[in-house]
């Protein structure tokens, strides 16, 4: 729960001086990106902005405290303040902030600005006490916020120092409105108004001016002088002389003498006790101070001018002026040291009664009360964990003695899940092993099953599927039906293990079961994970259309539950890119891969390896080797600067080997082949991919026999495990092996099998990347006119893609080629005496590439009748009567010029 007072603008009090000159300057705040109010404590920053904000509706107010250095807490309150200003306009961001479903503050802010694009009225967001922020991530995120905020939004920041928000840049671009301590200092006229409101007997203008000069217009000093004068301890001028030259850091002695020593003992204790509360209401005050009628007491303190301010319009919440509050807390530690733990305990109990466990934990920690802290965690820790209050939980668990954790194994489990969420896998197992060793009878307890479920998750994450399977099975055997979270975890792990083993049908069933349980209990990240796994399994089985539909369900879940910022979102858009690539929808595949990189923008660059490999695949399918080389340089740099799972390395190696094949770089392939991992098995699509990389490198090096052994074994495994997409890929590579080895009939046989299987998988680009060798074979099959209709259609589509992206259309028939051809000693006399025009050479190249008359007309952007004329002329000049004769003639010319066709 969010504390309401942190989102409430301070109430404009009676008897305050209206700062007309400063309000006039602030009236143009909507013309600036940032309004920055800076000064030391006590110059009236908050009072000024509360005056300016009075009557404005489109304004959100966020009062910071030290706890707001936690990124998740900062995000929750900031978005809540925007919601306050827009009357709930940014619902998606609100849900993302509440559920912590964002990758970083900057990505959350980016989503916020998308929603605010539809908000056209002026909008203001006030952040008070920004000097309390010390987290550099928040500073960087707020710089991003200011750079990208909508034009109709003005950020108003109040701080005791110059914040790290790119101020100089804003100042140069005239996008900064600044008010500093010199402007905030009271003028003579304002000081006179101030004393007239506060003192029963007015003082002369000259006297108030001298006082104002003595304290340099410092508002807090003026307030202290008025307080002293009312209490008749000193004359106003004497107080002013004493305060002259004093700043906020030297006020303690003065405040003791002039404030605390001049109130009765009951009020003194009330001030000291209540000061431990960062914000307070009637119930908190009554519990912490022991006084009845807490609200009445607060209002009385307010009337006495003891630096208490209202935090909301209802008058329910109060807080002390920061300067005075800090002073009181220091005095409380000195004067009430023995009582302080009990005071904090009372505060914790009251916050708990009002439903604010995070505030209660703050006071339980301050009280040093391990038992209270334990009880709060037992009741609320998992809720805080699910809301990503990880720093607070970690601090709390560290404060508990080990014996307390052992007595409450669920807290040990919580600590282990914290470690797991931070990828500290080794520490998880060490912690659980120590706990099991010391907790009596835990092996017969359900908690042991929960430990095993977590251990199973750690094992699969750490690349140990056998151990993960053993632990997941143990957990499922021992867990009661009602322990749904651990059952979801164990079921998911078991499904993933079976996926790794190639048992796809069983794995799919378990992942569907995981999805059902996760949806039932609102465990959305496991629901998303199970859908992603289902899609991968269906892709491996060759059911790409069903995989697509499963991905659509996952995208829908992301939208409904606002999971866009989870790293798993990158996984989903990446496998969508793989599917689009397979279907030769390259522009969409590239856009999806780039979206994945965007999702991971706030993570280490190494996390982008898989999406970068996907971008390279798109470049390779287009035949854009220059772009592929540029991207490969970055990929190889990432490979050399990170530790990756074997699946990631295999995917990265795939595009490297294909690039070497396309460029004929045998040296690079040979060097890689000497050092690359040779997996023991090939029983899943990850391992199949690595062995396919090895076979492709062997084919490039002319090592046909070992490559054939590899591919035949891969096919045997793929058929046995029904890895139909892998079988399709393997057949295409086997085709290239046979073709280059001169075994043309074998090459044609496996190509026909690959085309038939592609009716199921929909593969296009897997054929395209094999380039001209594939194009030649497809031309021959098309010319034979013996392919079934579906295969014929696919062959033509593949050929068009090859021609489009790899530029084989008429590359061999350009002007330079024709000139060399005509000067060749073996050129047919008919061509020498009746040379073709350049356009006719182009048409011959397109006929050779398998284009129909309509396609040639479209390619050359001329009428179909014109193409018929060109064809008739070139047939006559070549001395041929049919299209097949023209193709054979072109093939002979290419062979004569040294092209292997």
From Swiss-Prot:
<keyword id="KW-0119">Carbohydrate metabolism</keyword>
<keyword id="KW-0805">Transcription regulation</keyword>
<dbReference type="InterPro" id="IPR011990">
    <property type="entry name" value="TPR-like_helical_dom_sf"/>
</dbReference>
<dbReference type="InterPro" id="IPR023768">
    <property type="entry name" value="Tscrpt_reg_HTH_MalT"/>
</dbReference>
<dbReference type="InterPro" id="IPR000792">
    <property type="entry name" value="Tscrpt_reg_LuxR_C"/>
</dbReference>
<feature type="DNA-binding region" description="H-T-H motif">
    <location>
        <begin position="853"/>
        <end position="872"/>
    </location>
</feature>
<protein>
    <recommendedName>
        <fullName>HTH-type transcriptional regulator MalT</fullName>
    </recommendedName>
</protein>
<keyword id="KW-0804">Transcription</keyword>
<dbReference type="Pfam" id="PF00196">
    <property type="entry name" value="GerE"/>
</dbReference>
<keyword id="KW-0238">DNA-binding</keyword>
<comment type="similarity">
    <text>Belongs to the MalT family.</text>
</comment>
<keyword id="KW-0010">Activator</keyword>
<dbReference type="InterPro" id="IPR036388">
    <property type="entry name" value="WH-like_DNA-bd_sf"/>
</dbReference>
<dbReference type="Pfam" id="PF17874">
    <property type="entry name" value="TPR_MalT"/>
</dbReference>
<feature type="binding site">
    <location>
        <begin position="39"/>
        <end position="46"/>
    </location>
    <ligand>
        <name>ATP</name>
    </ligand>
</feature>
<comment type="subunit">
    <text>Monomer in solution. Oligomerizes to an active state in the presence of the positive effectors ATP and maltotriose.</text>
</comment>
<dbReference type="GO" id="GO:0005524">
    <property type="term" value="F:ATP binding"/>
</dbReference>
<dbReference type="GO" id="GO:0045893">
    <property type="term" value="P:positive regulation of DNA-templated transcription"/>
</dbReference>
<keyword id="KW-0547">Nucleotide-binding</keyword>
<dbReference type="GO" id="GO:0003700">
    <property type="term" value="F:DNA-binding transcription factor activity"/>
</dbReference>
<keyword id="KW-0067">ATP-binding</keyword>
<dbReference type="GO" id="GO:0045913">
    <property type="term" value="P:positive regulation of carbohydrate metabolic process"/>
</dbReference>
<comment type="function">
    <text>Positively regulates the transcription of the maltose regulon whose gene products are responsible for uptake and catabolism of malto-oligosaccharides. Specifically binds to the promoter region of its target genes, recognizing a short DNA motif called the MalT box.</text>
</comment>
<dbReference type="InterPro" id="IPR027417">
    <property type="entry name" value="P-loop_NTPase"/>
</dbReference>
<feature type="domain" description="HTH luxR-type">
    <location>
        <begin position="829"/>
        <end position="894"/>
    </location>
</feature>
<dbReference type="InterPro" id="IPR016032">
    <property type="entry name" value="Sig_transdc_resp-reg_C-effctor"/>
</dbReference>
<dbReference type="InterPro" id="IPR041617">
    <property type="entry name" value="TPR_MalT"/>
</dbReference>
<dbReference type="GO" id="GO:0003677">
    <property type="term" value="F:DNA binding"/>
</dbReference>
């Amino acid at each position: 729960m969010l504390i309401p007072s942190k989102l409430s603008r301070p109430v404009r009090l009676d008897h305050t001086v209206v700062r007309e000159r400063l309000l006039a300057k602030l009236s143009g705040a909507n013309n600036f990106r940032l309004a920055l109010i800076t000064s030391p404590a006590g110059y009236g920053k908050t009072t000024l902005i509360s005056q300016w904000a009075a009557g404005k509706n489109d304004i959100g107010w966020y009062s910071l405290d030290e706890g707001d250095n936690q990124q998740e807490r900062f995000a929750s309150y900031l978005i809540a303040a925007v919601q306050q200003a827009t009357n709930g306009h940014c619902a998606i961001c609100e849900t993302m902030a509440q559920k912590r479903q964002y990758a970083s503050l900057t990505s959350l802010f980016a989503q916020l600005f998308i929603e605010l694009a539809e908000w056209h009225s002026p909008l203001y967001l006030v952040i008070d006490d920004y000097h309390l922020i010390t987290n550099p991530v928040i500073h960087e995120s707020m710089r991003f916020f200011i750079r990208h905020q909508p034009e109709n939004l003005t950020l108003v920041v109040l701080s005791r120092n110059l914040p790290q928000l790119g101020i100089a840049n804003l100042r140069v671009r005239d996008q900064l409105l600044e008010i500093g301590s010199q402007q905030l200092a009271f003028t003579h006229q304002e000081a006179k108004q101030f004393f007239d409101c506060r003192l029963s007997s007015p003082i002369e203008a000259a006297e108030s001016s001298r006082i104002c000069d003595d304290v340099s217009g410092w508002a807090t000093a003026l307030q202290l002088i008025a307080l002293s004068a009312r209490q008749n301890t000193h004359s106003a001028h004497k107080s002013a002389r004493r305060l002259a030259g004093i700043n906020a850091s030297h006020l303690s002695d003065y405040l003791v003498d002039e404030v605390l020593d001049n109130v009765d003992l009951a009020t003194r204790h009330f001030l000291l006790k209540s000061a431990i509360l960062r914000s307070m209401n009637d119930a908190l005050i009554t519990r912490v101070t022991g006084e009845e009628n807490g609200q009445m007491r607060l209002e009385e303190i307010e009337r006495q001018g003891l630096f208490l301010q209202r935090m909301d319009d209802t008058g329910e919440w109060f807080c002390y002026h920061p300067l005075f509050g800090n002073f009181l807390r220091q005095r409380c530690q000195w004067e009430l040291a023995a009582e302080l733990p009990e005071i904090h305990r009372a505060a914790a109990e009251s916050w708990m009664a009002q439903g604010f466990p995070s505030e209660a934990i703050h006071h339980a920690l301050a009280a040093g009360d391990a038992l209270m802290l334990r009880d709060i965690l037992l009741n609320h820790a998992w809720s805080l964990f699910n809301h990503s209050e990880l720093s607070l939980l970690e601090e709390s668990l560290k404060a508990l003695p080990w014996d307390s954790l052992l007595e409450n194994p669920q807290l040990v489990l919580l600590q282990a899940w914290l470690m797991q969420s931070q990828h500290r896998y080794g520490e998880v197992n060490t912690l659980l092993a120590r706990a099991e060793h010391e907790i009596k009878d835990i092996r017969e307890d359900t908690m042991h099953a929960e430990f095993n479920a977590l251990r199973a998750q750690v094992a699969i994450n750490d690349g140990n599927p056998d151990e993960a399977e053993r632990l997941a099975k143990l957990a499922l055997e021992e867990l009661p039906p009602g322990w749904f979270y651990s059952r979801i975890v164990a079921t998911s792990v078991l499904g993933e293990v079976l996926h790794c083993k190639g048992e796809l049908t069983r794995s799919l069933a378990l992942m569907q079961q995981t999805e059902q349980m996760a949806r039932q209990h609102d465990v959305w990240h496991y629901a998303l994970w199970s859908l992603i796994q289902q899609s991968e399994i269906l892709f491996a089985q060759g059911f790409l259309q069903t995989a697509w539909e499963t991905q659509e369900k996952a995208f829908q879940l992301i939208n409904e539950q606002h999971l866009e910022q989870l790293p798993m979102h990158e996984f989903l858009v990446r496998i969508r890119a793989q599917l689009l690539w397979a279907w030769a929808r390259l522009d969409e595949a590239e856009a999806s891969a780039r979206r994945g990189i965007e999702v991971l923008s706030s993570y280490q660059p190494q996390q982008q390896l898989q999406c970068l490999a996907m971008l390279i695949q798109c470049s390779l399918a287009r035949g854009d080797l220059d772009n592929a080389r540029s991207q490969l340089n970055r990929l190889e740099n990432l490979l050399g600067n990170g530790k990756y799972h074997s699946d990631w390395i295999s995917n990265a190696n795939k595009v490297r080997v294909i690039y070497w094949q396309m460029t004929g770089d045998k040296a690079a392939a040979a060097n890689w082949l000497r050092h690359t991992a040779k997996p023991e098995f090939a029983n899943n699509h990850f391992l199949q991919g690595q062995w396919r990389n090895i076979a492709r490198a062997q084919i490039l090096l002319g090592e046909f026999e070992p490559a054939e052994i590899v591919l035949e074994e891969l096919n045997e495994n793929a058929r046995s495990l029904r890895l139909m997409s892998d079988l399709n890929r393997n057949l295409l590579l086997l085709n290239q092996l046979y073709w280059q080895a001169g075994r043309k009939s074998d090459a044609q046989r496996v190509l026909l099998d690959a085309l038939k299987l592609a009716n199921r998988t929909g593969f296009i680009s897997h054929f395209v990347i094999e380039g001209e060798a594939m194009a030649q074979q497809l031309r021959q099959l098309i010319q034979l006119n013996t392919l079934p209709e579906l295969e014929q259609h696919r062959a033509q589509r593949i050929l068009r893609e090859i021609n489009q992206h790899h530029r084989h259309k008429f590359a061999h028939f350009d002007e330079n080629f024709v000139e060399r051809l005509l000067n060749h000693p073996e050129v047919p006399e008919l061509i020498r005496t009746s040379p073709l025009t350049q356009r006719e050479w182009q048409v011959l190249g397109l006929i050779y590439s398998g284009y129909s008359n309509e396609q040639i007309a479209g390619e050359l952007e001329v009428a179909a009748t014109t193409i018929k004329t060109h064809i008739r002329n070139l047939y006559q000049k070549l001395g041929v009567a049919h299209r097949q004769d023209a193709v054979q003639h072109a093939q002979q010319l290419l062979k004569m010029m040294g092209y292997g066709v």
